[in-house]
A protein has these predicted regions:
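Conserved helicase motor core of P-loop NTPases
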Residues: 5, 9-160, 165-224
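C-terminal accessory regions
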Residues: 177-306
Length: 306
């Protein structure tokens, strides 16, 4: 038997209204709240949000517009609503706390769009890492993987949504593709395992980025145009290239859409999709990015993530 656990008040999968995993199966609903104590003011917020999801209301936004902060008697559990300037200041303060060196889940910035996640990662890294502008990746950088990569024995080297610390780093030019970048060993935040070396593209090198796109485009065309008996081999060559030359940034088209998605990102901010199910000591939610698009209109659905 297979038991699946879900929450119909969470954000659905991208481009899906509901999860297919829960269609046409026997289900049981658990209603007791256990993740927040009864005296935790955050519990009120989550109950309002859940009600808004079910009823199509905006009670959560109305509530935080009237109640700018609330804490329990110990002043250790609660929330504060900030304006943009205050939020930035608080972000720098929280990520400068020594607690994050012992617990990388101590604090996260949570945004709706991938663009906002990238902007926050850049802002935080430049705020807390000395000389961060000198290199796209440095020793002790906090990195989140957006992909799972396995070795020849099908054992995971890095896993999707897991956090890693840069353990060792060296400048490197890929011997096969002649792309500039860095050879990096990561250490898993949870478990402490050190990975085998992985090659990361230096996205500040314009020639390297142009050649990356050319190689990837050529390999895709070769696979699409290949005879049926060798098509699988051609696609394997493309994915071998992708996994051996990892990206820290998205590569976009002129119209703003994404051509090639990043494989890794700095681990200070996270999308609301990826954050679901996680627990942080301090959650810094970019409500404006979640509620409004760049034109000041509410997001109609999850497909608007960019």
């Amino acid at each position: 038997k297979l038991i699946l656990c879900g929450d119909d008040a969470q954000i659905p999968p991208v481009n899906e209204k509901d999860s297919y995993a829960f269609k046409g199966v026997t289900s049981f609903r658990l209603t007791q709240i256990v993740r927040q104590d009864e005296d935790n003011p955050i519990r009120t917020l989550t109950e309002l949000l859940r009600g808004d999801v079910y009823n199509g209301t905006f009670n959560f936004l109305n509530y935080i517009s009237r109640n700018r902060s609330k804490f329990d008697n110990t002043m250790t559990k609660g929330f504060v609503v900030c304006n943009s300037a205050q939020f930035q200041q608080e972000v720098v303060k929280q990520f400068s706390d020594e607690s994050i060196t012992r617990n990388t889940d101590y604090v996260k910035v949570i945004s709706y769009t991938n663009k906002a996640v990238s902007n926050w990662n850049k802002f935080i890294r430049e705020s807390i890492i000395k000389d961060s502008e000198k290199s796209v990746i440095t020793k002790n950088d906090l990195i989140t993987s957006y992909v799972t990569i396995v070795d020849q024995f099908n054992d995971a080297i890095i896993q999707n949504s897991e956090d890693y610390i840069v353990k060792e780093i060296a400048n490197y030019t890929h011997p096969q593709y002649e792309l500039k970048g860095f050879m990096v060993k990561f250490q898993a935040v949870f478990g402490g395992q050190v990975t085998s070396p992985l090659f990361i593209i230096d996205h500040r090198d314009k020639y390297t980025m142009a050649m990356y796109c050319k190689i990837a485009d050529d390999l895709i065309q070769q696979a699409k145009n290949a005879r049926r008996d060798i098509r699988a081999t051609k696609w394997k060559a493309y994915y071998k290239f992708k996994e051996s030359c990892l990206l820290l940034v998205n590569i976009g088209r002129p119209d703003g859409s994404i051509l090639y998605y990043r494989d890794l990102d700095y681990g200070f901010a996270i999308s609301s999709h990826k954050s679901q199910g996680s627990t942080y000591n301090v959650s810094m939610v970019d409500v404006m990015d979640i509620v409004y698009d760049k034109y000041g209109r509410p997001y109609p659905n999850a497909s608007d993530i960019n």
